[in-house]
Amino acid sequence: MSGDGINIGGFEIKYYGMIIATGFLLGLIVSYYAAKHENKFDPELVFDYLITMIIPAIVGARLYYVIFSWDYYKNHLSEIIQIRNGGLAIYGGVIAGAITLYIFCKKKHLSMLQFGDVAVKGLLVGQILGRWGNFFNREAFGSYTNSLFAMQIPTNFFIEHGRIDEIVSNGLYDKATYVVSGNEAATFIQVHPTFLYESMWNLVLLLLIIFFFTKRKKFDGELIAIYCIGYGIGRFLIEGLRTDSLMIGSTGIRVSQILALILAVFGTAFILYKRKKITK
């Protein structure tokens, strides 16, 4: 066993991959029972959709990450298909999953909105767990902080993994803290654990959707819209703390914040449109 994973027969299984896989599995279980509870379509179709969606979601998540990190990958083409060490963007996976859902529902003659209201619950479970993969990879963290929630990461981790530039370029290395504990001493950076913030935000959103909004749902697709609003607002706020955001070229504009705004606006517009239609 290493800090990054478990070694079985000479093959190292990364914690990152195990957490992503666990997120898929638990998300599937939650969506299955949600479909069973709502009883609007055969719950077994949730399994069929997951099998159909896994590969496109992973490809989409990786493609999104590579596109917005092209300045690096254009000189490291062989690394494009290496995902064991991270580099999967949630937005890319969600977009690919949504496209796959549209095609799947068309072929199965299902309501995409009904199916989507069930799927977002599993999606949130996957996102809640998936962010902990970032913890083990020591990525997706925020700027310097000395608050109660500060996460300490040894600078040696970045040196050993050839990632020292990550904390030098954003000024975190200059703010590193030298800590002595007994006979041992190490240098740490102190950062916002943005992966934790997003994981907890999504947990609250999931609980609200399951225990509050599901019972009060007035039309198909309402839970999708609430997810878009809730996740969009949370992601926009939390993304502002991160030091590794994917940018639009050299503009300094964070891609994820733009998409978060689009999600929130879309969700709000959809709810207003549907509720206005109901009152007519």
Q: Predicted regions: what is each one?
A:
Residues 1-280:
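A feature for loop-to-transmembrane-helix boundaries and adjacent hydrophobic helices
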